Each structure stands twice: as C-alpha cells, then as structure tokens.
Design a protein with these regions (language model features):
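Generic structural signal for secondary-structure transition and capping sites
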Residues: 43, 71, 91-95
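Axial heme c-ligation environment in periplasmic c-type cytochrome domains
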Residues: 57-66, 86-119
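Electrostatic cytochrome c docking/interface patches
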Residues: 20-39
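Inter-heme linker and motif-flanking segments adjacent to c-type heme-binding CXXCH motifs
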Residues: 22-27, 52-54, 72-73, 118-120
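Gly/Gly-Pro-rich "capping" loops immediately C-terminal to redox-active cysteine motifs
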Residues: 31, 35-37, 48-84
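Bacterial N-terminal signal peptides that target proteins for export
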Residues: 1-7
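The canonical Cys-X-X-Cys-His
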Residues: 34, 40-50, 99, 112
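C-terminal motif of bacterial Sec signal peptides marking the signal peptidase cleavage site
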Residues: 15-18
Length: 120
C-alpha cells in the first residue's frame, strides 16, 4: 500500500513540474517572420523573447506571454494594431518611454506584433 501511495505521489508531483514556469515559444517560432524580424531589429538586446535566437536581454521587460497582457508599457491597451504602432513608434504613444525608435517599418511591426501576440 505504501509503495502505491509513493508511486501516486511521485506521478502527481512529476505532473506538476510542467505547470507554471515561463511561457514557451509557439511551435512555429522558427518559421515566424515576426520572430526573425525581432532578431533582425535586435529586440533581444533589451528584451527576453521566447523563440527568438539570443533574445535574453534583461534591460527591459520580458516579452514572454505578451499575448496575455492587458497593457503595453502599463498604459496602452494591448491590441494587435496598438502593439504594432508601439513597435514602430513607441514615443507616439508614450512620449516619455525609454524604448527607442528602432526604425521598424509598419509591415515589419505588424509581423513582430503578430508573433508577440501569439506568446501566451
């Protein structure tokens, strides 16, 4: 009886090990234009972004689970169009932001925003 309980406890705890933790990149990350563009524009210099090579920045907020967030920079509603606008021209939405204008085109910002919105 004790061995059955021990086995059940081990299985239950093992199952919980996968709960919580940090969100992972979507399965399509390696094929996503948005992920490639985030790497190209060096977003990972400041941000940690799951699925983007070398995106382990610690200067700015992690973008893991960006798709679940209600606000961008704590002020701007996190919709796809607003996120794309933020990426392309952050100071137009939050004039005192520390996020620099990286020269991201509107089309590239749309692709990056779509990728980030998929991070849940």
């Amino acid at each position: 009886m004790c061995s059955v309980l021990a086995a059940a406890a081990t299985l239950a705890l093992g199952g919980l090990a996968g709960c919580g933790g940090s969100p992972s990149a979507p399965a399509f990350a390696d094929r996503s234009p948005g992920a490639r563009l985030a790497a190209q524009y060096q977003c990972g210099s400041c941000h940690t972004i799951p699925g983007v090579a070398a995106a382990q920045g610690k200067v700015a907020v992690s973008l893991a689970a960006m798709g679940r967030r209600s606000f961008i920079a704590g002020r701007v509603p996190n919709s796809g169009p607003m996120l794309a606008r933020w990426i392309a021209d952050p100071a137009s939405l939050v004039p005192d932001t520390s996020m620099p204008d990286m020269g991201v085109s509107a089309a590239d910002a749309d692709a990056i925003a779509a990728y980030l919105k998929a991070l849940r």
